[in-house]
């Protein structure tokens, strides 16, 4: 099944996003990725307040990485694309590509997420409507207990 197409997330880099060197502080690029994730969930029709309220189901990020390619500065326009992929029945990975206004890639990031049921933090299947958005992982992926 093809993933549901969503619009790219866009934002302007603010002064508060930068560090003393005048470039975006490294951790803020991961924040921008999470903003793009939240925007994608909203586009899918997910009630964000309920999704992030820990009301029985939690979807923590279990792994994050980012590679910086070019700096971003205050006032730059940023575009974030997301490539979603199912890893197994309860885990998925999002690959983010961040672009500046000129279309240059400035960073590539990945986050892995796991769906857990409270209070015992048992793994559960990825909830609707996310499965339709996620691409299937290659056959090597399995339901492992990472």
UniProtKB/Swiss-Prot annotation:
Family statement: Belongs to the 4-hydroxybenzoyl-CoA thioesterase family. DHNA-CoA hydrolase subfamily.
Pfam families per the UniProt record, alphabetical: 4HBT_2
InterPro entries: 4-hydroxybenzoyl-CoA_TE, DHNA_CoA_hydrolase, HotDog_dom_sf, YbgC/YbaW
Protein name, as recorded: 1,4-dihydroxy-2-naphthoyl-CoA hydrolase
EC number(s) on file: 3.1.2.28
Record: active site: 19
Source superkingdom: Bacteria
Lineage: Bacteria, Bacillati, Cyanobacteriota, Cyanophyceae, Acaryochloridales
Reaction equations catalysed: 1,4-dihydroxy-2-naphthoyl-CoA + H2O = 1,4-dihydroxy-2-naphthoate + CoA + H(+)
Function: Catalyzes the hydrolysis of 1,4-dihydroxy-2-naphthoyl-CoA (DHNA-CoA) to 1,4-dihydroxy-2-naphthoate (DHNA), a reaction involved in phylloquinone (vitamin K1) biosynthesis.
Keywords: Hydrolase
Pathway(s) of this molecule: Cofactor biosynthesis; phylloquinone biosynthesis; Quinol/quinone metabolism; 1,4-dihydroxy-2-naphthoate biosynthesis; 1,4-dihydroxy-2-naphthoate from chorismate: step 7/7
Organism annotation: Thermosynechococcus vestitus (strain NIES-2133 / IAM M-273 / BP-1)
UniProt GO molecular function: 1,4-dihydroxy-2-naphthoyl-CoA thioesterase activity; fatty acyl-CoA hydrolase activity
BP-aspect Gene Ontology terms: phylloquinone biosynthetic process
Membrane-spanning residues: none
Enzyme class, broadest EC rank: hydrolase
């Amino acid at each position: 099944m093809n993933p549901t197409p969503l619009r790219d997330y866009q934002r302007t880099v603010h002064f508060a996003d930068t560090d003393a060197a005048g470039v975006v502080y490294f951790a803020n690029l991961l924040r921008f990725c999470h903003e793009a994730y939240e925007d994608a969930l909203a586009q899918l029709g997910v009630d964000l307040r309920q999704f992030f309220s820990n009301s029985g189901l939690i979807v923590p990020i279990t792994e994050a990485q980012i590679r910086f390619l070019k700096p971003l500065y205050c006032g730059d326009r940023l575009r974030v694309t997301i490539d979603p992929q199912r890893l197994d029945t309860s885990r998925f990975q999002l690959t983010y590509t961040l672009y500046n206004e000129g279309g240059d890639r400035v960073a590539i990031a990945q986050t892995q997420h796991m769906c857990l049921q409270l209070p015992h933090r048992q793994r559960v299947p990825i909830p609707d409507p996310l499965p339709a958005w996620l691409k299937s992982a290659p056959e090597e992926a399995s339901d492992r207990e990472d």
